[in-house]
Amino acid sequence: MNKAVGIGACVMDTLINVPNYPKEDTKMRAESSKQAGGGPVATGLVAAAKLGAEAEYIGVLSDDAGGGFLIKDFKKYGVKTDNTEVLSGYRSFTSFIWLSAKASSRTCVFDKGNLPPLKLNDEQKKAIIGADLLM
């Protein structure tokens, strides 16, 4: 079996479906909304796990609602998080993505949060060295 390891930012996306983009300083009801894990690393790891690879995320997440969502989402798809640091007192990387039905387009507004950069420990280094694929 192939092993994929991902390092980097993972994002809690809120996808908001709207019929069209609203004018500035107005209100509009969304047609629907949902939350999903996002970012290139998270998306790639989930895809690898769905295809049967052993997948693992190495990174830093917050213990806030966004970080908790991402941990649960990874577990749901079989992505290991044993080497993920979960820290208190920080904000998760989040994004709000508006999907316009009329324009068939998307607009993303994001908050990178304030998590510190990852400092690799020996276990994390070992997992990276043992990977067949690094994302």
Task: Show where each model-derived region lies.
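Glycine-rich phosphate/adenosyl-contacting loop at the front of the ribokinase-like
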Residues: 1-60, 65-69
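Short secondary-structure boundary/capping elements
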Residues: 36-43, 88-91, 115-120
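Short catalytic-loop micro-motif centered on adjacent basic/acidic residues
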Residues: 56-59, 83, 133-135
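Active-site-proximal loop->helix
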Residues: 65-77, 97-99
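A glycine-rich helix N-cap at a beta->alpha junction
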Residues: 73-90
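Conserved phosphate-binding/catalytic loop of the ribokinase/pfkB sugar-kinase fold
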Residues: 86-87, 97-135
